[in-house]
Amino acid sequence: MGARASVLTGGKLDQWESIYLRPGGKKKYRMKHLVWASRELERFACNPGLMDTADGCAKLLNQLEPALKTGSEELRSLYNALAVLYCVHSRIQIHNTQEALDKIKEKQEQHKPEPKNPEAGAAAATDSNISRNYPLVQTAQGQMVHQPLTPRTLNAWVKVIEEKAFSPEVIPMFMALSEGATPSDLNTMLNTVGGHQAAMQMLKEVINEEAADWDRTHPVPVGPLPPGQLRDPRGSDIAGTTSTLAEQVAWMTANPPVPVGDIYRRWIVLGLNRIVRMYSPVSILEIKQGPKEPFRDYVDRFYKTLRAEQATQEVKNWMTETLLVQNANPDCKQLLKALGPGATLEEMMTACQGVGGPAHKARVLAEAMSQVQQPTTSVFAQRGNFKGIRKPIKCFNCGKEGHLARNCKAPRRGGCWKCGQEGHQMKDCKNEGRQFFREELVSLQRETRKLPPDNNKERAHSPATRELWVSGGEEHTGEGDAGEPGEDRELSVPTFNFPQITLWQRPVITVKIGKEVREALLDTGADDTVIEELQLEGKWKPKMIGGIGGFIKVRQYDNITVDIQGRKAVGTVLVGPTPVNIIGRNLLTQIGCTLNFPISPIETVPVKLKPGMDGPKVKQWPLTTEKIEALREICTEMEKEGKISRIGPENPYNTPIFAIKKKDSTKWRKLVDFRELNKRTQDFWEVQLGIPHPAGLKQKKSVTVLDVGDAYFSCPLDKDFRKYTAFTIPSINNETPGIRYQYNVLPQGWKGSPAIFQSTMTKILEPFREKHPEIIIYQYMDDLYVGSDLELAQHREAVEDLRDHLLKWGFTTPDKKHQKEPPFLWMGYELHPDKWTVQPIKLPEKDVWTVNDIQKLVGKLNWASQIYPGIRVKQLCKLIRGTKALTEVVNFTEEAELELAENREILKEPLHGVYYDPGKELVAEIQKQGQGQWTYQIYQELHKNLKTGKYAKMRSAHTNDIKQLVEVVRKVATESIVIWGKTPKFRLPVQKEVWEAWWTDHWQATWIPEWEFVNTPPLVKLWYQLETEPISGAETFYVDGAANRETKLGKAGFVTDRGRQKVVSIADTTNQKAELQAILMALQESGRDVNIVTDSQYAMGIIHSQPDKSESELVSQIIEELIKKERVYLSWVPAHKGIGGNEQVDKLVSSGIRKILFLDGIEKAQEDHDRYHSNWKAMASDFNLPPIVAKEIVASCDKCQLKGEAMHGQVNCSPGVWQLDCTHLEGKIILVAVHVASGYLEAEVIPAETGQETAYFILKLAGRWPVKVIHTDNGSNFTSATVKAACWWANIKQEFGIPYNPQSQGAVESMNKELKKIIGQIRDQAEHLKTAVQMAVFIHNFKRKGGIGGYTAGERIIDIIATDIQTTNLQTQILKVQNFRVYYRDSRDPIWKGPAKLLWKGEGAVVIQDNGDIKVVPRRKAKIIRDYGKQMAGDGCVASGQDENQEME
């Protein structure tokens, strides 16, 4: 049903349009509100026809009222409109919406039925706060009966998903539509969502997680249930998969009830929240009002994002009270703060209506200018006091006559009042003869700039400034072309005598419209020409136009002649209440007016493709009409500016383009997919290897920070390479050939643009640096830091020279990002005249921390550690060790909470760094903080740090302070060389004797800097020293340990040269732990001096590195014992070589331990399982192990006992059937394909769940294996046209499963779980997920045996395909044989019989079937011929001449 506009007629419509939307407001109801209401009713599955009568409106109000509490703002607006409409139909006199709502409330209270008894009244009062939208209703007999959801409710839910697509409004809409529903109803709602399979998969995973959590917290009661008692629901019962509708109703209506429907709704809402966060990733903190954005639009964005935030209502209320005002633009914020803290949203909207942006400023300017233009009486009107006639005074600020600049009411203009340029005042202006407001700038007698000399013809456009040209082919004529005396009017090329308007001021000129003269602004951003109240002849028609300040009503006059600077244009003029007269593009294009951007005349950098490669030839994909129109408009402007050029069909290259809408804007942005060109383009060397650091800056008296605008588009591209950047704008339905362009400048997104721009900028700045050696310029991409020791005026003059120098080469430096006064914001730092710091850092306060929150927190702390000494993050980093999802909640340990609290205290006091003085020495001081964490300061004067930092890496499990100190020194030295070009003098907390004792043995490890000792506790020392020679007279201990890898039982012991021996049994150990345990026993049983001999290289390596800390408890105990000894000698001998004491102790500890280790293959099987986690069948088969041994290896692996051994066995399906599905892991998408008959697996991580990626995967699969049928779910990627086209081309039949029916995708669903399980077992062996996926696929296909035939999946698929080929060939042979007939003679009967059917042909006989009898006939008595139809057997029979071997073999 369409939108209804005829609900009211006659007097009712007049009454409707006299009612105000708000009390005290200005806006009234209009016809459009009725149309909107009817459309909204269709969305909510209500009949718009009910709006025609009062009774119908009452029914609609009763239907919508229960959902008001949880509904959106749109629902409330609809309810309000219907309430007003009801009053109009009922002839109830009201003046605004609030009065209508009051009347409705009165009516409802009057018609409210009186309760018969107090209990009924109490029940009614209780029910009044509860929605009556319950599918469970009570019958007359008192039984609770379930009413299924109506098709109208389901239709409303589907429309919500289609229109909103998981925006934040979906959650309250779902809550409203599903109130009181059973799990079966909720599953019905979910099943109606056909597309969005990725979102549904996420929802399914959340429901599974919540169901598992429910089962953990609600264990099954022990023992049988009493008769008649309901069982407790499990998680799967609540989700509606293992419970019936009757059970759900029984739980919900029991006493006490179990609200399974509400619990399931809560789970679904949790999943929807996660989906909404993915579809709406913008945080509420990022919602800020733009300088030109209306307050109303900002509030809409704010509340839309607020609904998506996962926070409590109290937190959301706080966000509304603080962030809404805090993030408004300055114009609105000033008004909002004036309203006070208790202001309502309505008051805010009213106060900020029309505030901010160009429209607001234009109105202020227009008011000021109108006051200025009023005739005023000035003291200078009495001119009789002066000799001669003087010219009237003129304002330098606004250019009007009659007042001085100090009395001007117009907004103050920045820059010089004489020439209009920034950077100096009028009294310091050196631009003689140039007047900012002189008439020549807006008339034909204007200066014409000098064109470049003829030897620079290569440049396309090279104006000295960005200017607005009124260009054309004709020459201008008029008086005053010769110019005034003293003015330079030299023209290098007469044919280019174009009028030129600089943009140092607003381009306002005088134009003649019809017969009237007006001042108007030339606006290249406006589509239409709009003039304030003007009397024009001819017919007009009303029109509504939208601008920055809102909609205004105008009169449209067509075919109006407009004279602009002597050029005439005929077009449409709109007349209405505009704050500024505007000449738009509809007239500017007729007179040839262009906005010219300079392209630099610099030498281009030659670029080539990689050897052997050609340019990209990627077809342009289809685009929508609005995108094509947007791209045409953008490219037309770029072509006028010389950035791109049109090309013909001779260029064979193409790169696809597309368009996206800019953030929070209706404008489009052009994007070019240069991925293919980037692959083929030569590699570039980044000329800048890092970003500059403020600690390396020398202190300067004057500083300025600049930003280069339109950087890439001001830099030319190599002419020979331009052809490879070609792209095409297509047309709808191939109406016309596509428009072809190529780039003339560096394109955005191309790999060479950054390096070429940096190199070009360096060449451009080189002559300026030579000319001004006193100026220091730090350049990083388009950010420029300019420092000098000149006086401020001289410095700013030099900066203007730099800006002019860049401008000559085509690089502009916008005033908006020109920082003249400190503090300067540069590269994330805040620079002051004598100090620097990082930009303000505020650590978030959170009750719940996720992995992503911790990562951001650690990043902030690392950034702050540049200047804040003492910051530590080791305990915080421990919280997020391992592979975790970004949204996983993290529980703080006590150590991490303490560390964060200490960091907060450190950041409370702002700290600053100083600048570098080349005349002073660099000093680096290092302190030990404990727990493997170090901090350092680099300074030139004590307590004035240039830079600070921290170090907390532990490169091995067993280390000591000396090792870590060496690593800190190496880091600080490298950092100093990068920033200052030299190494500092180190002050280390270690005594010289300890340091030199270490370096005596480890001098070859690294380089030693210059250093001195500083007594800063805690000091670094070596806690024990190992002897280099055996200790004479000390007892010698031969130590050894052994462990059984299967039982984890072991022994450790020692034998001494004095006859002592000891052996202990150890549980749950390994060979390496047993060896260390033996050394610990020797140290505990020995005296102050001891010699120890071991055959373990592992133990020898740990102890010889002299660690003083370790993550191993056993090694820590050994360290404690070593510190107690006076002298220790440790030696190693090879095992099992007949060495006396070693052999004795080896026999001692091996007794009862190493028996099973003599089985061949166990070591190899263990290594194979550690790497691939093979199942026991594969190991038993590959390494000839008994099944019990192989099973024990699997049982001893902690990673293989998560869910037990996988179940195997597949349905014997057709060999060509594959099942495909997408699963999600670590936030990435894995596309899985399973060969149903064999269980063989193909999987791949794909960048996006799109049809294109899926089709590419299917084609790769079809290229490797015979694929006849693919079975998928109904996901949008599988149902896409791209996949259908790929299946058609590869002759693959596509079948679809049933949504939410796991049996339809059983093979691939179970394989998804198996794949994730294998990935979990080997994830720590791979850095990237895509590597882990391929490793898991290899393990599944070739390292797991079982199922049909006891094969691996790889062997099984090969066997199935080979068998299928053989049976197909055999069937072909059988069919061939059956095409022949046999004539035969039986016994001695000379008459040929037949024809009989040939069943099989052997070497000596054939098997035939004749009249149902199967006979074996010798070959010599049979004649085989092809069946040519009916033949007569006899003497002249064709059988006698037929060769039986003809066409038979």
Swiss-Prot record:
GO terms for molecular function: aspartic-type endopeptidase activity; DNA binding; DNA-directed DNA polymerase activity; exoribonuclease H activity; lipid binding; RNA stem-loop binding; RNA-directed DNA polymerase activity; RNA-DNA hybrid ribonuclease activity. A motif (Tryptophan repeat motif) lies at residues 995-1011. The record marks 134-135, 365-366, 379-380, 434-435, 442-443, 497-498, 596-597, 1037-1038, 1157-1158 as: Cleavage. Mg(2+) 3 binds at residues 1221, 1273, 1309. Binds 2 magnesium ions for reverse transcriptase polymerase activity. Binds 2 magnesium ions for ribonuclease H (RNase H) activity. Substrate-binding is a precondition for magnesium binding. A zinc finger (CCHC-type) spans 393-410, 414-431. The record marks 223-224 as: Cis/trans isomerization of proline peptide bond. Residues 518-587 form the Peptidase A2 domain. Mg(2+) 1 binds at residues 707, 782-783. It comes from the Viruses. Residues 8-43 are annotated as: Interaction with host CALM1. Signal peptide: none annotated. Residues 12-19 are annotated as: Interaction with host AP3D1. The modification Phosphotyrosine is found at residue 134. Residues 447-489 are annotated as: Disordered. The record marks 997, 1010-1011 as: Essential for RT p66/p51 heterodimerization. A zinc finger (Integrase-type) spans 1160-1201. Residues 7-31 are annotated as: Interaction with Gp41. A motif (Nuclear localization signal) lies at residues 26-32. Residues 73-77 are annotated as: Interaction with membrane phosphatidylinositol 4,5-bisphosphate. Zn(2+) binds at residues 1169, 1173, 1197, 1200. Residues 499-503, 547-553, 586-598 are annotated as: Dimerization of protease. This is Gag-Pol polyprotein. It comes from Human immunodeficiency virus type 1 group N (isolate YBF30). The lineage of its organism: Viruses, Riboviria, Pararnavirae, Artverviricota, Revtraviricetes.
